[in-house]
């Protein structure tokens, strides 16, 4: 790629497959030959532990220490901060210390731009940077959206997400207007789909009817699968854990959809 793209994976609802999607799309990009960094920006540290660092609270360096160095005008030592995962992605881990920054950032000058300023030097090293946001619309998520070029929104298909989606899109719009006018919505990906239930079928139809005129709704639908949760406890991606499973094939398909969308945009930009 000619330049790095930063993608925030966000939804204030928990249990929508957000971390699983961030992890597997990021590793999917790496499997397609791209240089990828994943930033765990959730104080729960689920992405960090899902990638095999189970004792993440004991890590000496994490995303919170990076923010701390920046706030205190100290140098950020990226080499000791960034972890290397065997599946060819780099990781900036998170632990519970990050929870303190929701309050600490309140008194920081240009507080919404803190993460953006921290990762700016890393843009030259990667094709894609993924940010796994916390399940909230607080200051951490606003920081992630301010740092991002695009936001990918996982939406689970077990219930109608209308209110939650409206709130999230309002937050994205507010960040676009006031902080980051370059922010775009990458698309909506439907997750945890059980094709045997009427609620899943109804939700899929409602999401397409409600949003597809203005927002890309990806064709790929991620199925509900125990393999996905098993993979996260093994420290591996779904491709490594169960490469022939339906959920692995779905994430592979989603990754290709996102890559093809990027290639099409590059072609259109080049032809102008």
Residue ranges: model-predicted function:
Residues 1-272:
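P-loop NTP-binding core
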